[in-house]
Amino acid sequence: MLADPITLTVNAVPFTLNRTGETDQSSPNSSVYATSDLNRHLRVSHQTAKIDTVRSLIRSEVRKVSADPLNASISTYKTVSVYLVIEHPTAGFSTTEIDQEVQGFKALLTTSLVGELMGGEV
């Protein structure tokens, strides 16, 4: 079981997310964490993808109120999600080897690359 609460730091601002007790409907082996204002969520789950393969997911979501660009008097919640899925066999790779792949992937996600992705580059 992960720590409770979990601290997620975004742009040098720490956010405390407490376990809510709910699970992700798509996976009974999951947990949901949220800030007290419910504007940030962290979802963690594990699913069996194949007989010997597990799909582990960690997903961060943040929502905010945003004005309609065509009608400033109308505001709605908008959400952005960032997540990582690690699909791994139940045997054959050590936790250290998987972590090395994750750390390499995280290093790839520079500000420049994220900007290019948001610009629609492939």
Where are these regions (language model features)?
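A generic structural signal for short, non-catalytic loop/turn and secondary-structure boundary residues
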Residues: 1, 37, 53, 75-79
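Short, intrinsically disordered N-terminal pre-domain segments
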Residues: 1-18, 114-122
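A structural detector for beta-sheet-dominated domains
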Residues: 9-11, 45-47, 85-89
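Extended, solvent-exposed segments with strong compositional bias
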Residues: 13-35
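Amphipathic, interaction-prone secondary-structure segments
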Residues: 27-59
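Short, acidic/charged, Gly/Pro-enriched secondary-structure junctions
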Residues: 59-65
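Beta-strand-rich solenoidal segments
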Residues: 65-117
